[in-house]
């Protein structure tokens, strides 16, 4: 077929003229230049919360959905229009929570940076606690994790306000109330004792929980109830968070819940830390109090056991041997009556016979 095209002189010029006109090339170029049926756009994520779009038609980079950057340190915009706060500790990001207002997120960063870096840290706003150290004392009384937890749950302002009322007066100066709390009987009478509990070995052991006596729990710390086939029972949810202040002004956060398995009310999260810091041991007494004022603030403190724990050997329900003084527990025997006394006499007789046999051998 190629030979016939070359031998025909009449068609040579046509073939040459046709070859000079770039019809195939034009068709190919049209095919290459025409956009595909489905337009394809490549996305490249940029920094600062913006995404860069590579437009395949004109080859230009265009910005879309660019989030406005914040003018405050430690504040980052969120796609939903809210603002997040963050701080870096040892090259790791610590998330402080999400807030509706940009200034609120900036204030949360300022609180965190004063706890993490100290009072001289660079903040977004001028510190409002110059001239008194109420907030500094509050920050020092709580760990970094506790401050971050308050900021995330938006409870920092409430807890600081409770502490500030006991720390400063109307002029913003120390009121000395923290010392009066322990030295003034009138202040002590402003609290009512709810109940006391002597902690058991399991309360201060590896179970990491404190069992609240049922009668006191239902009276002073009632939980929302739910209707079941057995009647009204406390809601078996994850429980609620309660704040209790100790005598140093430190606020302790405990998770208070109801366990269906053991049908008991317990303090779980936060309790093990309280045991460790206060060095609680079995036999110590934990006291729960409530203020008589309108705030109804809850308090917790503890007392060392009045006498050392004595290990007693029991046989058939009778205290027969006291390990601490290595003598028979005469007091326990005297309280049980004549029957237990006769049993104790028989036991003593048996011990003396065994001792006599050993001496003979």
UniProtKB/Swiss-Prot annotation:
Compositional bias segments (type: Low complexity): 9-27
Disordered: annotated segments: 1-73
UniProt xrefs under SUPFAM superfamilies: DNA-binding domain (SSF54171), DNA-binding pseudobarrel domain (SSF101936)
Pfam families xrefs: B3
Residues passing through the membrane, by range: none
Stated induction or repression of this protein's expression: Expressed with a circadian rhythm showing a peak at dawn.
Tissue: Expressed in leaves.
Main location: nucleus
Keywords: DNA-binding, Ethylene signaling pathway, Nucleus, Repressor, Transcription, Transcription regulation
Annotated region of DNA binding: 71-126, 195-306
An MF annotation (GO) of this entry: transcription cis-regulatory region binding
DNA-binding found in the keyword field: yes
GO terms, biological process: cellular response to hypoxia; ethylene-activated signaling pathway; photoperiodism, flowering
GO cellular component: nucleus
Task performed by this protein: Transcriptional repressor of flowering time on long day plants. Acts directly on FT expression by binding 5'-CAACA-3' and 5'-CACCTG-3 sequences. Functionally redundant with TEM2.
Subunit relationships: Interacts with FT.
PANTHER family assigned to the protein according to its UniProt record, in alphabetical order: AP2_ERF AND B3 DOMAIN-CONTAINING TRANSCRIPTION REPRESSOR TEM1 (PTHR31140:SF109), B3 DOMAIN-CONTAINING TRANSCRIPTION FACTOR ABI3 (PTHR31140)
Family: Belongs to the AP2/ERF transcription factor family. RAV subfamily.
Protein name, entry field: AP2/ERF and B3 domain-containing transcription repressor TEM1
Gene behind this protein: TEM1
């Amino acid at each position: 077929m190629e030979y016939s095209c070359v031998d025909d002189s009449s068609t040579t010029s046509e073939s040459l003229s046709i070859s000079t006109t770039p019809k195939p090339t034009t068709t190919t170029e049209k095919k290459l230049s025409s956009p595909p049926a489905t337009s394809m756009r490549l996305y490249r994520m940029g920094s600062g919360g913006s995404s860069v779009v590579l437009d395949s038609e004109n080859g230009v980079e265009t910005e879309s959905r660019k989030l406005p950057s914040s003018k405050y340190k430690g504040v980052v915009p969120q796609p939903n229009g809210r603002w997040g706060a963050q701080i870096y500790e040892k090259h790791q990001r610590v998330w402080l929570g999400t807030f509706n207002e940009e200034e609120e997120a900036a204030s949360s960063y300022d609180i965190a940076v004063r706890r993490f870096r100290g009072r001289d840290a660079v903040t977004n706003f001028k510190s409002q606690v110059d001239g008194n150290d109420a907030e500094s004392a509050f920050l020092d009384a709580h760990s970094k994790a506790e401050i971050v937890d308050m900021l995330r749950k938006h409870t920092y302002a409430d807890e600081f306000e409770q502490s500030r009322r006991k720390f400063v007066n109307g002029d913003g100066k120390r009121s000395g109330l923290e010392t009066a709390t322990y030295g003034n009987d009138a202040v002590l009478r402003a609290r009512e004792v709810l109940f006391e509990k002597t902690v058991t070995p399991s309360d201060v052991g590896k179970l990491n929980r404190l069992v609240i006596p049922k009668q006191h729990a239902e009276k002073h710390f009632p939980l929302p109830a739910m209707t079941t086939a057995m009647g009204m029972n406390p809601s078996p949810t994850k429980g609620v968070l309660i704040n209790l202040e100790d005598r140093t002004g430190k606020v302790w956060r405990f998770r208070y819940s109801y366990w269906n398995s053991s049908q008991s009310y317990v303090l779980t999260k936060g309790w093990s830390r309280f045991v460790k810091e206060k060095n609680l041991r079995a036999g110590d007494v934990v006291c729960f109090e409530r203020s008589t004022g309108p705030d109804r603030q809850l308090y917790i403190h503890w007392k060392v056991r009045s006498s050392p724990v004595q290990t007693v050997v029991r046989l058939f329900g009778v205290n027969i041997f006291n390990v601490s003084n290595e003598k028979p527990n005469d007091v326990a025997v005297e309280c049980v009556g004549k029957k237990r006394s006769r049993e104790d006499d028989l036991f003593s007789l048996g011990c003396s016979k065994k001792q006599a046999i050993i001496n003979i051998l």
